[in-house]
């Protein structure tokens, strides 16, 4: 009888479940085929070594993929499709469950929405008094290193939805999640603007490449 380590990813998944697969095996399952002279497991291993992790792989752009032997446009499209499926899954899950059950769930959702974006995107999650999700919206879009945020528009949308609280989030395409002075200032402005309408700002999360910063966790909110 074959041991689990000797099984191909598909057979291993069918026998022991998807969670039994390593990152290399899971990637090989999606890639399906290798390249001339290189089987799919070897290709998957080399790709992960190049990008460091699944996170680094799925947030990479095509220019970064071009430096990897065996990755053409077709396989790049496959991998970006996987990332988009994950993003849509979290979006649907958020809408259907209508609840942020933990800080981890909030972070995972925001990472799924903002990772890999080439411009700064400012997203707001609107919550009711029980912290159930009413809506999440990409309210502002900017450049590579700046996004202009208008606090009054956030408040206007919150009032329209009858929201009692909001969670702010934006990405840093550079990869470093550390907040800038401008990030801190705009957070203060949004908080002050929301306070006039008795709307709480629960957190502001900055999403980088494989890292994040939570203003609430740092005691800034």
Swiss-Prot record:
A motif (JAMM motif) lies at residues 170-183. SUPFAM superfamilies: RuvA domain 2-like (SSF47781). The keyword Magnesium does not apply. One of its GO terms (molecular function) is metallopeptidase activity. The keyword Protease applies. Zn(2+) binds at residues 170, 172, 183. Keywords: Hydrolase, Metal-binding, Metalloprotease, Protease, Zinc. InterPro entries: MPN, RadC_JAB, RuvA_2-like, UPF0758, UPF0758_CS, UPF0758_N, UPF0758_YicR. It comes from the Bacteria. Residues 99-221 form the MPN domain. One of its GO terms (biological process) is proteolysis. Pfam families: RadC, UPF0758_N. Belongs to the UPF0758 family. YicR subfamily. This is UPF0758 protein YicR. It comes from Salmonella typhimurium (strain LT2 / SGSC1412 / ATCC 700720). The lineage of its organism: Bacteria, Pseudomonadati, Pseudomonadota, Gammaproteobacteria, Enterobacterales.
């Amino acid at each position: 009888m074959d041991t689990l380590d000797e099984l191909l990813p598909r057979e291993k998944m069918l026998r022991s479940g998807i969670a039994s697969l390593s990152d290399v095996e899971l990637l090989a399952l999606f890639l399906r085929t290798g390249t001339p002279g290189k089987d799919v497991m070897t290709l998957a291993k080399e790709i992960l070594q190049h990008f460091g992790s699944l996170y680094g792989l799925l947030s990479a752009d095509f220019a970064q993929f071009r430096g990897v032997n065996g990755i053409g446009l077709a396989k790049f499209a496959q991998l970006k499709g996987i990332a988009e499926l994950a993003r849509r899954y979290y979006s649907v899950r958020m809408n259907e469950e209508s609840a942020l059950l933990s800080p981890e769930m909030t972070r995972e959702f925001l990472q799924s929405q903002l990772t890999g974006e080439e411009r700064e995107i400012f997203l707001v999650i609107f919550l009711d008094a029980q912290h159930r999700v009413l809506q999440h919206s990409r309210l502002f879009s900017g450049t590579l290193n700046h996004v202009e945020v208008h606090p009054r528009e956030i408040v206007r949308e919150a009032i329209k939805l009858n929201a009692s609280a909001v969670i702010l989030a934006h990405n840093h395409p550079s990869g470093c999640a550390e907040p800038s002075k401008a990030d801190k200032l705009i957070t203060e402005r949004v908080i002050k603007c929301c306070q006039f309408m008795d709307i709480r700002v629960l957190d502001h999360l900055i999403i980088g490449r494989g890292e994040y910063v939570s203003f609430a966790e740092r005691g800034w909110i």
